[in-house]
Amino acid sequence: EISLGLVGSEMCIRDRDIYKERKLLGEKLVSPILKAIDYDVEHTVFSFIPNTAEVAFYGMLEGFDNYLNELKVRKIEELGHNPSHEELEKILSWRIRSEKVAIKDIKLRTFIAEGNSRNDLAAHVYDITYGSLVPHVDNLVIIDDSIVRGTTLKQSIISILDRLNPKKIVIVSSSPQVRYPDYYGIDMASMDQFIAFKAAIELLKERDMKDVIARAYHKSKNQTGLPKEQMVNYVKEIYAPFTNEEIAAKMVELLTPKGTRAKVEIVYQTLDGLHEACPSHTGDWYFSGDYPTPGGVKLVNQAFIDYIEKIYQF
């Protein structure tokens, strides 16, 4: 007989662990965000996409509070032995600016709809809080839990945030780039659903590297008759020529609507950051392509073949 009290305690412990992990995912993004805003914390407003990214947002804020405290200490030390009250007050008054910029105006998520209806829905999910930043002066950093398709970014979020006239919009993903289908619970088997995959394919085309696509396809096709235990995930070769930053930059081009005034950048969590934040959870196959079973490799192999034969008509 299982004690309900014991089960409840274990669930509470697990919930607490998940909360800590999500906060740490946000905290670990401080360094790349600083680079994206050119270290101009004073003229940056931090926010989050409701509602799943809220915990990572708090972790990100804690990370920036720690950064700002270290900066305050250095600035005070530079004042020497006899700083004035005004000098100290000015430094100690520095604060990380956070606002709830994006508001979910209907309780719907875009993944519940399909096709065109998904795009129609995406345009109506979010609204913004005017007056939350100084137009043309402040950067806007806004964190989300993940970016898979990019549908809501392209159809809704970037355009809506741009109405606030920020100098720069930095979209932050608390998880790494989703590059591969899951196959173990989340139904997203089509390769062309992933904005990371689309970006990598576009980069290969632009840089006259279509031979990489052809080689990956033929390697995948040639192993279809093998036992699944002998199969290799050759889709990794599509991403291999590029850095995470190059792929993210191409995503920005693909997702930024025409007429957007603000400069846009996307910052992603790294795989190392993910593992450091969640050391007890080694499953990272939809980010890394390292499937835990041969069946996953077989399925991604077929998904890639299906995509190529549909698009390129091999």
What are these regions (language model features)?
Residues 3, 7-314:
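PRPP-associated nucleotide enzymes
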